[in-house]
Amino acid sequence: MSASESSATSSVAPHDHGSSQVETSIPQLETLISHLVAAKRSLSSINHVWRANEIVTSARSALEESVVVSARTGFLRKGLNNQLRLLYSVRAEVEEVSVRGRSEFAGVLRSLDAADARLRKTLNLLRETIVHASFRPEGEEPKSLHDFVDERGVEELNSALKSAIDRTNAAQTELETSNCAFDDELQSIKEALGNYRAVTKMASSRTSASSSSSSASNASLPSMSGVPSMLHSLEMHAQEMANLLESLVRHFDLCVTAVKHTEGGGAAARSITGDMPAGMNVSGRGGPNIEEGINANLNAPLDPLSNSEYREMVNVLIKDAAEAEDVVMEIQDRIGEMESIYENILGQRDAVLAVYNATTSVFEHISSLASARLAGYIAQAHTFTRVWNDEHEHIQGGLSDLSDLNTLYDGFLEAYDGLILEVARRRHVRQRVEKVLRDAKHKLDQLYEEDVNARETFRVEQGDYLPSDIWPGIGREPMRIEFRRISGGTLKGVQDQHPDEDTAPPSDPKDVANHTTDENRDEGETIPALPKALVEEALARLKARNRQAT
């Protein structure tokens, strides 16, 4: 103890009885040292204060980041919705092209199948219809109507139609492949959207649980409305912790002063304050260097204190010592609350970032599709439309040609039945002509015989009286009438169509040795003798066609 301290002690020693009772209540140096050690230990709470400052700074940064990211997410989401609507609109239009093309193509194929079936049926009827032998040269192999038809036109038409169908099928296959790839792209986007919705739902539920704001119920995007109030709460906690730490520092300074003013306490104070808790000498973290202040207080010269001032200081020290532990506990409670709030803020920030990342993932899928492959999918639809329009025109032309061929061949069948009826009609007319000829010949023969007999009777009765040269014809037989068959020439209409064909010349009368009315002679045209059943069948078929036509 120094001389000045001794003189000071001795000067306050003689007091009355009351003063001595007060002096006996002053704690011993060991008690003051224990309070100093406890005060020094309480200063470790400065780490909580530093942590509180870090939390406030980080939370403010997280809030700023969340606001920026949330704004970006909202902007992207608006663009995303527009892009999705446009994308699905394009897919719907491409699908409409495909569906319409398939429907039209299927309808055309059905029409082609029906036309081809009709043509095949007609061709089969031509094969089944055998030309009656009386129409053909004697000894010729039997022929059907199909033998008179050149099917090369049908084959060429079918080949052209097959090529058009193959090209349409190829274009349709390419479109279907393109649409499947488009659907795969959309499925990938749907999966990204599913992840986006799951992340958004989780983020919204997290923010809803941490915020009582009505906007937290909006499940579209996580709400940040509760973060400013939480940041304000962190700032209030940090400020209050700084104030509490300041009170602990004042208590520590008071303990140091009390120990130094106590006999033998100077060395103890220097020894105790020689190794301050970690963080006391950290500068540049937003607060003063507390250790420098403590060292300045420790090394400062002692101001003289009266006994009453000393006792008052000690009483304040003891009172503060009883509350120091509560202050430390309050700092710990506040830092714990701040950590919880900070974790909540970081969780909301992470939720916003997760939604942003999920949004950008969907946007990247759409951007990649739109920039690299969407134009190809649209172009494929246009290519199919162009090919189908061209081939549709070709197929329609082929369909018309098939119908014309069927009409032609069906007309051939009908014409053959008409030919049978025409032959039957001509034979009937020939029979009538022959009957007229027979009747006329019979009457002419009768007239001839009557005339001969009359002439002979006249000659017998009057011949002796008439000179022979009075009329040379008096002794001639009567004129005879002969019928001659002349081969028919070409009809006038046929001559107009084929002017180069020579018509058959009429038979020379000198070539006819014996003219007769026999209908089986070869002079003139030859009319086949057709069975009655064949004629009746042809007539029945013609009537059936007429009923179908009406």
UniProtKB/Swiss-Prot annotation:
Cellular location(s): Cytoplasm; Preautophagosomal structure membrane
* Coiled-coil annotated spans: 315-344, 427-457
Q: Where is the composition biased (Low complexity)?
A: 1-13
Please list the GO terms describing molecular function. molecular adaptor activity; protein kinase activator activity
Q: Which UniProt keywords apply?
A: Autophagy, Coiled coil, Cytoplasm, Membrane
Pfam families per the UniProt record, alphabetical? ATG17_like (PF04108)
GO CC annotations on file: Atg1/ULK1 kinase complex; phagophore assembly site membrane
Q: Which family does it belong to?
A: Belongs to the ATG17 family.
**Function recorded in the entry:** Autophagy-specific protein that functions in response to autophagy-inducing signals as a scaffold to recruit other ATG proteins to organize pre-autophagosomal structure (PAS) formation. Modulates the timing and magnitude of the autophagy response, such as the size of the sequestering vesicles. Plays particularly a role in pexophagy and nucleophagy.
Q: What is this protein called?
A: Autophagy-related protein 17
**What organism does the record attribute this protein to?**
Aspergillus terreus (strain NIH 2624 / FGSC A1156)
- Per UniProt, what is the name of the gene that codes for the protein in this document? atg17
